[in-house]
Amino acid sequence: LIDQLNAATAPDTYAYVDVDAATGQVNALGMDAIRVGLLYKPANITPVGRTAVLNTPAFVTGGDGEARNRPALAQAFEEHATGERFVVSVNHLKSKGSACSAPDTGDGQGNCAVVRTNAANLLAQWLASDPTGTGDPDVLIIGDLNSYALEDPIVALGRAGYVNFIEAFRFMGGGYSYIFDGQWVILTMPWATPR
């Protein structure tokens, strides 16, 4: 992907966080065909601190006994123009489609809501522990949380002190991030520590 992006733009316009090389772990982000990753523009920002992966059984299974969530990635960056630092955490929580051991409760959150909620709580705890070792409190959570705005995983992130960018700033002209079957909803949303 990086080669294609750089071919379409200019050499070295984009780079990626090589998680296995940075952590010394083979398949640190798992072996599934779907994995998280992090691309960036090295002309604007530089990775700093440790590349961190949350791939504990408790997080990946969400308490379900089988791998359900993708391992999470955290990387701190320093912006060249200002010297400011921030941490980006990329995530992909369990989808609503296939079943887990905990049945769909019929509350509208779909299958595996408890798995996503457990993962959101563990993610917030992990990020609070400074996994990148930079001591920087500015954290941006991105990726596919597979949860709508008022579902339990999202509420858990709010309780942990994170702010929903779409709600806070009314991005995208009306507060939605996903359209499916004619419904406009907030599904994949960035979260950040308040400043």
Each predicted region: which residue ranges?
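Divalent cation-coordinating acidic motifs and surrounding scaffolds
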Residues: 1-195
